[in-house]
A protein has these predicted regions:
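Peripheral (often C-terminal) accessory segments that flank ATP-dependent C-N-forming ligase machineries
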Residues: 2-99
Length: 99
């Protein structure tokens, strides 16, 4: 799940303090940095596509839910992410389970 700054891909602010990174305790998850910087002791935004939240699960549905749980814990002024990532794979998985 790419977590981006408001305004991306056009103009976006930089230097917004990112919160929640130290509180993530979702098993088998990771947060990858791309548009971040370290200012004093704070991790701040420094790009449009700021972070990427990923997670594992026993299936696609669980992995997506875990990744979204990670993304929900991360915040800064103007952060956003799409809420439809993986929907086709999740639908296919559900359809296969109902057959």
């Amino acid at each position: 799940i790419v977590i981006a700054s408001d305004g991306y891909p056009e103009s976006y602010s930089k230097g917004d303090v990112i919160t929640g990174l130290d509180d993530i305790q979702i098993e088998d998850s990771r947060v990858f940095h791309s548009g971040t910087a370290l200012e004093k002791n704070d991790i701040v935004t420094n790009g449009g596509r700021v972070l990427c939240a990923v997670a594992l699960g026993k299936n696609v549905t669980e992995a997506a839910a875990n990744a979204y749980a990670v993304a929900e814990q991360i915040d800064w002024k103007g952060s956003f992410y799409r809420r439809d990532i993986g929907y086709r794979a999740i639908k296919r998985e559900r359809d296969e389970q109902s057959n």
